[in-house]
Amino acid sequence: MGKKRFFDDRLKYLSFIQNTGEKKAISEKIYPYISRLSQNKSYLRILDAGTGDGTINANIIKSFHRYHPYTSLLITGKEISYEDLKNTLEKMPDRFVEHPNLLVTMTNVKFSELGLIESASKVNNKKIREFNLILKSDNSYDFNSQITGNKLGDFIKKYWGIEIDNKGRTSYSNPCIVRIYREDNSRHLKQFLLSLIHI
């Protein structure tokens, strides 16, 4: 095993992030950039890597809707941790109500592999595991039931695992991608979905 870092210990890491103003400070640094984006954009892509517990991700969506309520937001989160993935997804139901024109993508691959995850069938000689959750209804209660439901939950439990090599380095057991969007807003996202979904 390599040298142990404080964020390798889950309890120490959670204690740190829950008792500092780091996420609030980072979010507040981002808001001015979002407010100054051109109003003429039809869409915006944002990469949040790693998402951690999803706080900054959720704050970005809130801020984006404040200034660009009708613009398509394609936000990709990169996170290898099973727990952080769940925490991030649990923050999304309200965001889909607030900003319907939203495509949330979550993946666990490395930075160098992000360009492959949407266009290839394999990454690092491993089959890409995909799950597309198309949200039905129009309220956060129903969205929460679907996002935290068994179908997506079973996919995550089965495929979103971690492997550790003999040097203590972590990697995914399967390259995964999860996409979530509202069915009643798919017409606005169609141009992006046609090029992404290949299952």
Question: Where are the language model's segments positioned?
Answer:
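Generic structural signal for well-ordered secondary structure
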Residues: 23, 53-54
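Class I S-adenosyl-L-methionine-dependent methyltransferase module
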Residues: 39, 53, 59-195
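Conserved strand-to-helix beginnings and helix N-cap segments that scaffold or border functional pockets
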Residues: 27, 57-58
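Conserved S-adenosyl-L-methionine
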Residues: 50
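Conserved small/polar residues in nucleotide/adenosyl-binding loops
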Residues: 197-199
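Conserved beta-strand elements of the Class I
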Residues: 45-47
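Class I SAM-dependent methyltransferase Rossmann-like catalytic core
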Residues: 1-41
